[in-house]
Swiss-Prot record:
Swiss-Prot/TrEMBL keywords: Endoplasmic reticulum, ER-Golgi transport, Golgi apparatus, Membrane, Protein transport, Repeat, Signal-anchor, Sporulation, Transmembrane, Transmembrane helix, Transport, WD repeat
Entry's Gene Ontology cellular component terms: cytoplasm; endoplasmic reticulum; endoplasmic reticulum membrane; Golgi apparatus; plasma membrane
Organism: Schizosaccharomyces pombe (strain 972 / ATCC 24843)
Protein name: Membrane glycoprotein spo14
This protein's encoding gene: spo14
Example GO BP: protein transport
Residues on Lumenal side: 368-395
Single GO MF descriptor: guanyl-nucleotide exchange factor activity
Domain of life per record: Eukaryota
WD repeats: 250-285, 290-326
Length: 395
């Protein structure tokens, strides 16, 4: 675990390799004096000759932004190319919102800028930019309810959707899952034909994250409103090879989360990570069991990403705090399914031990009060048995 306090509010990040990352943010168009920045960082493990080792951050510099640039609101990286959601406004008119940077020595330099849509006001921005390496495509989502998939090579628009809020996307070789408003829409990657729509199991839901899992399952993280309060849940849909459709698998409420702010997932092992509005980060397994829960941020997480090898998680918040956590142990545990051995097996394993304790209890401690002692003994055993064998799924 390592922390770094940045000099600016952080809203976005992406990994460049297993040890290097880009972090973006800033004060926006306000007159706060906080500059809008796109910074490159890396970390390394330091092992001194004497004392305990620790992780330290190394700053590699900043990518120069234009004077008219807004805060960096989204980031993505693939094969020496960095993409960013940065509004550029001159005289109140939006010029562009998608930046493409290429490698130059140890930093990056801007090589192109695009505008795919027009914003109605200064509050709208590009919330998502994500490379899809399997298809050489870039997914772009903006807060004016517009979504685009463009070619990485010539930036031609391959697919677009308007009138809905898109928060996240996930893909396989032939399928595309989009978190759209209160549902997950699944498309065929080759034709962009709608294959299936998966609705959340509650009303007034907003899907904030989606990902494919092993065995073609799909997990979605969503918020919902009930009695004027906001709650958070996970739902898993399992694929039926017979019907070639996804069916409802299981649901898990995230107690006290107060909503989902960020979501990421390790597709290979099934590790699910959810950041809540209560400033928590939850690590979940493939069967939606909570593995761990940590509180490292004082403000809700604005972005978090797994390293390419899924060994480290980096998260940022609007107070400029960057946290690095090593999560390899959760990755290994996420695919392990803990089976209930059953009451009969547990009793058979405990029986010899219980008999030995009973003999000691009666013969040595209470030789003249055997009936009362037997009653007290079995009451005690029943209490211990029920306490440690009844499983609690309340997360």
């Amino acid at each position: 675990m390592a922390e770094l306090h940045l000099s600016f509010p952080a809203y976005s990040l992406c990994w460049i390799n297993n040890h290097q990352m880009a972090v973006g943010g800033g004060g926006g168009t306000t007159k706060s004096g906080v500059k809008n920045k796109l910074k490159l960082l890396s970390y390394e493990d330091y092992e001194p000759e004497v004392g305990e080792g620790h992780t330290k951050f190394i700053e590699h510099g900043e990518i120069e932004l234009k004077h008219s640039d807004d805060a960096v609101m989204s980031l993505g990286y693939f094969k020496n190319e960095l993409i960013a959601g940065i509004n550029n406004t001159i005289d109140g008119k939006l010029i562009d919102h998608l930046r493409l940077y290429g490698r130059k020595d140890k930093l990056f330099e801007e090589k192109n800028a695009l505008r795919l849509t027009d914003f109605d006001n200064d509050e709208q921005y590009q919330r998502l930019c994500l490379f899809e390496p399997l298809h050489d495509a870039i997914c772009i989502s903006c807060t004016n309810k517009s979504f685009f998939i463009i070619s990485k090579n010539d930036h031609k628009v391959l697919f677009e959707k308007h009138g809905s809020d898109v928060y996240d996307v996930s893909s396989t070789e032939d399928k595309l899952a989009i978190a759209v408003d209160d549902r997950v829409e699944i498309y065929d990657w080759n034709t962009f034909e709608l294959v299936q729509v998966l609705y959340m199991p509650v009303e007034r839901a907003t899907v904030r994250g989606v990902s494919f899992l092993p065995n073609q399952s799909i997990v979605a993280a969503y918020n919902y409103i009930k009695d004027s309060k906001r709650f958070a849940s996970l739902v898993r849909f399992d694929y039926s090879s017979k019907n070639q459709l996804w069916r409802f698998g299981m649901i898990r409420d995230l107690k006290n989360a107060k909503g989902v702010t960020c979501f990421c997932c390790d597709k290979e092992n099934g590790m699910i990570i959810v950041a809540g509005a209560d400033c928590s980060i939850r690590f979940m397994s493939l069967d939606l069991t909570k593995l761990s829960q940590v509180y490292k941020h004082s403000l809700p997480v604005t972005d978090m990403q797994l390293s390419p090898d899924s060994e480290a998680l980096v998260s940022v918040s609007a107070d400029g705090l960057l946290c690095l956590q090593f999560v390899g142990k959760f990755k290994n545990l996420s695919a392990v399914k803990l089976e209930d051995a059953g009451v009969i097996l547990r009793l058979s394993l405990m029986f010899p031990f219980v008999l030995a304790i009973l003999y000691f209890y009666l013969q040595l401690l209470f030789p003249d009060e055997k009936l009362d002692a037997i009653h007290r003994f079995f009451s005690f055993i029943l209490h211990i048995f029920s306490k440690y064998t009844i499983r609690n799924y309340d997360l």
